UniProtKB/Swiss-Prot annotation:
The keyword DNA-binding applies. PROSITE patterns: HOMEOBOX_2. Promotes differentiation and/or maintenance of the vascular procambium, the initial cells of the developing vasculature. Part of the TDIF-TDR-WOX4 signaling pathway that plays a crucial role in the maintenance of the vascular meristem organization during secondary growth. Is required for promoting the proliferation of procambial/cambial stem cells but not for repressing their commitment to xylem differentiation in response to the TDIF signal. This is WUSCHEL-related homeobox 4. GO terms for cellular component: nucleus. Belongs to the WUS homeobox family. Pfam families: Homeodomain. It comes from Arabidopsis thaliana.
Amino acid sequence: MKVHEFSNGFSSSWDQHDSTSSLSLSCKRLRPLAPKLSGSPPSPPSSSSGVTSATFDLKNFIRPDQTGPTKFEHKRDPPHQLETHPGGTRWNPTQEQIGILEMLYKGGMRTPNAQQIEHITLQLGKYGKIEGKNVFYWFQNHKARERQKQKRNNLISLSCQSSFTTTGVFNPSVTMKTRTSSSLDIMREPMVEKEELVEENEYKRTCRSWGFENLEIENRRNKNSSTMATTFNKIIDNVTLELFPLHPEGR
C-alpha cells in the first residue's frame, strides 16, 4: 500500500512538475507577444537602434547634390569677407595700366574683341590685379566721356555764335537804325533832285527874261537865298539893264 501511494504521489508530483514546466515554456514562448496584446507603450529603443537611426537620417539629409552648395557656400566666404571692407572688390588701376590703356585708345582702339581683351588683360596683369571685364568697361566709359566732351564743346561753340549774331550783325536795334537811315536817305534824294530842277528852271526863266541865255549860272545847287542874292548882284554889277535905271525919273 505504501509503495502504491508513493508511486501515485510521485506520479502526481511529476505530472505537476511537467505541467508547470510546460506552462513556463509556453509563457516563455508567448512572452514577446505579450506587450502587443496588452497595448502597453513601446519600450524605448536601445542605444544601438538609436545609432543606426541617426546614421540613416544623416545619409538621407546629406546627399551628393547637397554637398555641392555647401562647398560653394564655403568657397564664397572669402568674398563675403571682402564685402565687409568697402572698395575691396573694386578695380584699383595702377598708373602703368592707365597709361597703356590710354595709349591704346589714342592709337585708334575703341571696341576691342574678346581675343584683344584677353591679351591686354594678360599684359596688364604684370602691373597689378586686373580682369577682362575691367578692360572692357574702361573702353566703354572712355568712349562715353569723349562723346560728352564733344557735346559740351559743340554747345559752347553754338552759344558763342548765337551771342555774336545777336549782338553784332543781327542786332534788331542796329538793323532798325540802318533801315530807317537808309530809307530817309532814299527819300531825301528825290526831294533834292526836285529842288534842283525847280531852281534850275527858275534860273533859266529869269535869264531868258533878262536876255542872257548864255550866262553861266554859278552855284545852281545852292538852296539858300543868300546865294541867289549874290548871283543877282554879280549880274547887276557886270551889266546895266534898262529895266533897272540907276537914276529913275521922278526923284
